A protein has these predicted regions:
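Beta-strand elements of well-folded, non-transmembrane domains
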Residues: 41-45, 59-63, 72-74, 84-86, ...
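A short, structured loop/turn motif at beta-sheet edges
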Residues: 26-33, 61-63, 71-77, 106-107, ...
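Hydrophobic residues positioned within well-ordered beta-strands of beta-sheet architectures
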Residues: 35-39, 53-55, 66-68, 80, ...
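Beta-strand-rich recognition/accessory modules
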Residues: 115-187
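Polysaccharide-binding surfaces and accessory modules of carbohydrate-active proteins
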Residues: 79-132
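Short, surface-exposed beta-strand/loop "edge" segments at domain boundaries and coil↔beta transitions
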Residues: 43-50, 105-111, 121-125, 157-161
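Extended, loop-rich substrate-binding clefts of extracytoplasmic carbohydrate-active enzymes
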Residues: 1-61
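Acidic (Asp/Glu-rich), glycine- and aromatic
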Residues: 51-53, 64-95
């Protein structure tokens, strides 16, 4: 399973090539405002040969999405998946992000994958009906062997947002900020 944000490459005949678990890690910082660490992966086979992958992950206090910066060699396209559970939820794609909302007992969970428009390359659903193999994927273009994307979730009982509309507005605002970052010029 790609869980929420795991990478894979679709090959011929709907065969997926996926990275395995990380083989090494390095904690860069673990402060009160930001946690930052790096994950190294063993080389893995893609549809056209060997893939090299390293991720730098940051999670800022108060944010609902973690930022994942990937250094990747061996492909110019890749996808990040969200595992589809037994009961099909609602998939929504908007500009440069994808959400999957599903009921969970008496609550709702919403997973999200987001990227910049320059990396965005659509989305697709892979649903062979096999447990842990059903996913919705956000597709990416790799630029200069790098990719930046964001992964997170919302749980309706967290009381962090007043409802799904507020969560959706948070995502739309965040997508706009990611696409138009603040720049500071010092003279």
């Amino acid at each position: 399973s790609r869980g929420a944000g795991g990478l894979g490459i679709k090959g011929a005949d709907d065969q997926y090539f996926v990275s395995k678990n990380f083989t090494a890690y390095n904690t860069i910082s673990n402060g009160p405002l930001r946690t930052l660490f790096q994950l190294d992966y063993a080389d893995w086979e893609g549809p056209e040969g060997k893939i090299k992958e390293q991720k730098t992950i940051s999670l800022d206090y108060g944010n609902n999405l973690m930022k994942i910066e990937v250094s990747i060699e061996g492909t110019d396209k890749i996808s990040a998946g969200i595992s589809l559970q037994q009961s099909m939820g609602i998939i929504h794609e908007s500009n440069n992000f994808l959400t999957y909302k599903q009921n969970h007992f008496d609550t709702t969970l919403s997973n999200v994958i987001m990227t910049t428009l320059k990396h965005y390359d659509g989305y697709h659903i892979y649903n062979p009906g096999i447990k842990d193999q059903n996913h919705v994927f956000l597709d990416f273009k790799i630029l200069n062997e790098t990719l930046t994307y964001y992964v997170g979730f919302y749980w309706s009982k967290s009381n962090q947002f007043s409802g799904h509309e507020a969560w959706d507005q948070y995502l739309n605002d965040l997508a706009m900020k990611i696409e138009n970052p603040i720049t500071v010029n010092i003279k």
